Amino acid sequence: MRVVPDTAILVRMNAKASGPARRLLERIAFGPHELILSPFLLEETERVLYYPRMQALYQLSPDEIREHIAGLVSVARIVDPVVREPVVPNDPQDDPVIYTAVDGQAEVLCTLDRDFYEPGVIEFCRKHGISVMSDVELLRSL
C-alpha cells in the first residue's frame, strides 16, 4: 500500500513516540508498503519538532530530529508535487499534502486533521484513488 502521512502523523512517528503512528512507520518501513513524502512534508515535520510543545512532549535533541528526518528519507519515495488548484478550503497550507498523495499515486492519506475529512476534500481524493484514514484505521487495514 502506498501511504502519505501528514505532518502531525510524521511527528508522531519519531523514535521517542510509542503510539499508533510509530507502529505504522515500523509496519511500512519493514513491510511491502511504500511511504511517500515530499520536501514540503519533511521540512514541515522538522520545523514542528522544534516547537516548544513538541520539545516538551518528546524532548528530541537537534541530532535526534535530524536522525528522524534522515530515517524517513531512507525508507520513503520522495516526490516533488505541483499544487494545481486549491483543495482544502479551510487550510490552503494542507494542499501540498494532498498533492504529495496525488503525484505520488498514494492509496492512502493518513491524517487526524479534520480539514482532510471535509466532503469536498474526500471527494477530490476519491477521484484520485486515495482514501483518507487515521493512523489507527490504517494500522487495522495493513
Regions found by a protein language model. Give the residues of each.
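Residues at secondary-structure transition points
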Residues: 19, 36, 63, 88, ...
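Acidic, PIN/NYN-like endoribonuclease modules and their adjacent C-terminal/linker elements
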Residues: 104-108, 114-142
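Short secondary-structure boundary segments
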Residues: 7, 39-40, 112-114
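A generic structural signal for short hydrophobic patches within well-formed alpha-helices
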Residues: 10, 42, 54, 116-117, ...
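Active-site neighborhoods of divalent-metal-dependent phosphate/nucleic-acid chemistry enzymes
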Residues: 74-108, 120
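PIN-domain endoribonuclease scaffold, especially VapC-family toxins
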Residues: 27-83
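Hydrophobic/aromatic ligand-binding patch that stacks against planar heteroaromatic rings
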Residues: 27, 100, 124
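Short, well-structured N-terminal submotif of metal-dependent ribonuclease cores
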Residues: 1-37
